[in-house]
């Protein structure tokens, strides 16, 4: 499901959720809300803060050290620079919903 399909899902399937406060949510409002959440998570991660959404999961930064790698085509050694890797770890409610 891509972002557009998810926004449509949020507006069309809100009535199936007994706790749905978004029963009258328009697609424009749903898109604004989703964009705000995404931008907020990105901003927090850029600021080196972990984001924990209880039940859903957590977004974290893991620092990867500089290391030596190989070019798979030529086999030549090359340096892979250090970088920060964003990661997501699913929460209990999300894991339970999948099983």
Curated annotation (Swiss-Prot):
Listed InterPro entries: Hist_DNA-bd, Histone-like_DNA-bd_CS, IHF-like_DNA-bd_dom_sf
* Lineage of the organism: Bacteria, Pseudomonadati, Pseudomonadota, Alphaproteobacteria, Rickettsiales
Q: How does it assemble?
A: Homodimer.
Name the Pfam families for this protein: Bac_DNA_binding (PF00216)
Sorted alphabetically, the keyword list is: DNA condensation, DNA-binding
Under the heading PANTHER family, the entry gives: DNA-BINDING PROTEIN HU, DNA-BINDING PROTEIN HU-BETA
In which family does this protein belong, per the annotation? Answer: Belongs to the bacterial histone-like protein family.
Any GO BP annotation: chromosome condensation
Q: What is this protein called?
A: DNA-binding protein HU
Function comment: Histone-like DNA-binding protein which is capable of wrapping DNA to stabilize it, and thus to prevent its denaturation under extreme environmental conditions.
Please give the SMART domains that the UniProt record associates with this protein: BHL (SM00411)
Species per Swiss-Prot/TrEMBL record? Rickettsia prowazekii (strain Madrid E)
Task: Report TM segments.
Answer: none
GO molecular-function terms, A-Z? DNA binding; structural constituent of chromatin
């Amino acid at each position: 499901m891509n972002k557009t399909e998810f926004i449509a899902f949020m507006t069309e399937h809100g009535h199936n959720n007994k706790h749905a406060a978004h029963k009258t949510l328009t697609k424009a409002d749903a898109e604004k809300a989703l964009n705000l959440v995404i931008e907020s998570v990105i901003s927090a991660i850029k600021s080196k803060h972990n984001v924990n959404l209880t039940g859903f999961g957590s977004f974290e930064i893991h620092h990867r050290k500089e290391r030596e790698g190989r070019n798979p085509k030529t086999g030549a050694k090359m340096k892979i620079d250090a970088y920060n890797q964003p990661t997501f770890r699913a929460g209990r409610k999300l894991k339970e919903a999948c099983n």
